[in-house]
A protein has these predicted regions:
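Short beta-strand segments enriched in small/hydrophobic residues
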Residues: 21-24, 62-74, 190-196
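Hinge/beta->alpha junction and helix N-cap segments in small-molecule ligand-binding domains
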Residues: 55, 72-82, 101-109, 131-136, ...
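Flexible loop/turn connectors
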Residues: 244-350
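Short acidic/polar active-site loop segments enriched in Thr and Asp
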Residues: 18, 66, 123, 189-190, ...
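Short, well-structured alpha-helical segments in soluble
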Residues: 111-122, 127, 237-255
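Alpha-helical recognition/docking segments in bacterial nutrient-uptake
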Residues: 1-3, 7, 62-181, 185
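N-terminal helix-turn-helix DNA-binding module of bacterial transcription factors
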Residues: 1-65
Length: 350
């Protein structure tokens, strides 16, 4: 291979490292470091291939910045605002200022923000929130982050490990399986699930874990009682209205009554409680309700809501540390377990 045709990607393949690692080893970075053994491997590969680094790329990689970009789906959702508070606190300790993008789950807006952060030479980008079952959109964002990291930036995510970056992974399935076991232990047998958007991977994982937990106990979930809806308070409200219309909520309905409703996030559960009250139903007297996340606003909800607690502010700090950490050749995955918190909305039956 002649030196006129050698690219940084060729060097990365020759050294057996990622493109981002090869870039940092050769171009340098004011923000990220490479382990000495990786740097030596990359430089040796570059020498073998007679690679000539690009002066402009080196200048950009070494440029200093105090910006950290944070992408969330909906900053009005306390789940994301609490993660953002953890990111902001960790960024401030590192002398950085957070630039926030609330994308309303729009993949195009995510890409545009990554491109903006690249132009502004932000030190790192964090993507917080579950992905959708959309290979094209996920790959496009992953490619944009590879390009960003190849120029010296750091990147990390909260959610599914689909973007090729260090990721804080929420153990959704095991958490909801445990919730199913504990509610079953309190006497609940017939459930409905407010399942969120059909292609949202976090919603799918939470539903799947709950369904598996019930099946293992010999109490299979009726598919007719799985209600897709928006991942919002209003989505939970409308989904509960549909269950009431089916006649399965409360003892006076036309169908076989359910014991409890599990909403795959807390804001949906809050909406479901409001819809139940609007229909003249008592929570938990007529129907028990549980959620997921333990968002901070639950302290104002009556009855207190059974949920799965996530350390949301700590998750924000963790993902910031990953985004700012020295480069690692393979993406690091940090699992976070949820903790079932039983409260007044799901009292023992009988």
């Amino acid at each position: 291979m002649s030196d006129m045709t050698v690219t940084l990607s060729d060097v990365a393949r020759e050294a057996g490292v990622s493109l981002a690692t090869a870039s940092r080893a050769i171009n340098g970075s004011a923000n990220r470091t490479v382990r000495p053994e990786l740097r030596e491997r990359v430089l040796a590969a570059a020498a073998r291939l007679r690679y000539s680094p690009d002066a402009n790329a080196q200048a950009m990689a070494r440029g200093r910045t105090t910006a950290l970009g944070l992408i969330v789906h909906d900053i009005a959702d306390p789940y994301f605002s609490t993660i953002a508070s953890g990111v902001t606190a960790a960024a401030e300790r590192a002398g950085l200022v957070v630039t926030l993008a609330s994308t309303d789950r729009d993949a195009g807006r995510e890409l545009a923000f990554v491109e903006l952060m690249q132009r502004q030479r932000a030190r790192a980008i964090i993507v917080a929130g579950g992905r959708y079952d959309d290979d094209t959109a996920n790959q496009a964002l992953a490619d944009a982050l590879v390009e960003y990291r190849s120029r010296g930036g750091g990147a990390a995510a909260v959610g599914q490990p689909l973007l090729g970056v260090d990721t804080v992974v929420i153990e959704n399935r095991s958490a909801t399986a445990e919730l199913a076991r504990q509610l079953h232990g309190r006497g609940y047998r017939r459930f409905a699930v407010l399942a969120g958007p059909p292609r949202h991977l976090t919603a799918h994982e939470r539903l799947d874990g709950f369904r598996t937990g019930l099946a293992d106990l010999g109490a299979p979930l009726d598919p007719d009682l799985v209600v897709p809806c928006a991942f919002t308070r209003d989505g939970g409200y409308e989904a509960m209205e549909r269950l009431v219309a089916q006649g399965v909520v409360g003892r006076g309905g036309s169908g076989q009554p359910i014991d409890a409703v599990f909403a795959v996030n807390d804001v949906m559960a809050v909406g479901a409680m409001a819809a139940a009250r609007a229909a003249g139903l008592d929570v938990p007297g007529d129907v028990a309700i549980a959620g997921f996340d333990d968002i901070i606003t639950l302290r104002d909800i009556t009855p207190s809501l059974t949920t799965i607690r996530l350390p949301l502010a700590d998750i924000g700090a963790m993902v910031t540390e990953l985004a700012l950490a020295p480069d690692n050749d393979a993406p690091r995955l940090v699992p976070v377990d949820g903790e079932v918190i039983l409260r007044d909305s799901t009292p023992p039956l009988g």
